[in-house]
């Protein structure tokens, strides 16, 4: 599940301004960056804009990037910093009222209602986490970075990463338990996430 590093030759070409090489990098990492940003900000159009801005910053900073560092770690440092800037700016802006009729419904076909309900509850619980816990959890469980890569990307200690992920998972499980949703061990036959009856 770990995110692979880009080809060093492609990375060097991109550092020298080769747009084709940079587009290869963007294509390789655009989806994981977007998914991470979307889960942090919760709004698709904002996540799309922020993802574009992240890659603009990466393009601008690439000539100064040290090839001795892991690219994915640096990429998610840039991403984290841009998202935190946006979240701080949002806190200072007045909030608009959202009409629930304007929110599109989630449509997933061929999935049992209970499973969709459980998945939705998981994402609600993740969204309720504070940004520090949410960032660490998403980088691990959605993006697939190692604990060490997360520590580097978030510029925190390895012990702090482990605690944040542990605490985030614990908080999500408690939130789900409050909604009556239980998890069965993956080793059990036909293990699924279901609402408790």
Residue positions per predicted region:
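Arg/Lys-rich amphipathic alpha helix in sigma70-family domain 2
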Residues: 60-67, 77-97, 115, 167, ...
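Amphipathic alpha-helical segment used for protein-protein interaction
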Residues: 5, 12, 16-19, 91, ...
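Structural recognition of an alpha-helix C-terminal capping motif at a helix-to-coil junction
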Residues: 35, 49-56, 69-81
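Internal acidic/polar
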Residues: 1-8, 85, 93-119, 146, ...
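DNA-recognition helix of helix-turn-helix
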Residues: 80, 84, 88, 133, ...
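C-terminal edge and immediately downstream basic/flexible tail or linker adjoining helix-turn-helix-like DNA-binding
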Residues: 1-3, 13, 95, 124, ...
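Sigma70-family region 2
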Residues: 15-16, 39-44, 53-70, 89-91
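Short, charged helix-capping/linker segments at alpha-helix termini
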Residues: 3, 13-24, 34-53, 158
């Amino acid at each position: 599940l770990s995110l692979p590093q880009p080809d060093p030759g492609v990375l060097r070409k991109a550092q020298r301004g080769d747009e084709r090489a940079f587009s290869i990098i963007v294509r390789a990492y655009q989806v994981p960056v977007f998914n991470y940003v979307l889960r942090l900000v919760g709004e698709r159009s904002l996540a799309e804009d922020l993802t574009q801005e992240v890659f603009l910053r990466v393009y601008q900073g690439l000539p100064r990037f040290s090839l001795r560092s892991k690219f994915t770690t640096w990429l998610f440092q840039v991403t984290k910093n841009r998202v935190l800037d946006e979240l701080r700016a949002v806190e200072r802006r007045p909030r608009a009222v959202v009409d629930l009729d304007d929110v599109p419904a989630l449509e997933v076909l061929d999935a049992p209602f209970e499973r969709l309900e459980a998945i939705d509850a998981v994402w609600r619980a993740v969204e309720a986490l504070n940004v520090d816990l949410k960032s660490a959890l998403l980088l691990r469980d959605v993006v697939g970075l190692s604990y060490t890569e997360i520590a580097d990307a978030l510029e925190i200690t390895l012990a702090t990463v482990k605690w944040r992920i542990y605490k985030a998972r614990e908080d999500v499980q408690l939130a789900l338990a409050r909604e009556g949703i239980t998890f069965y061990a993956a080793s059990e036959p036909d293990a699924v996430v279901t609402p408790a009856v």
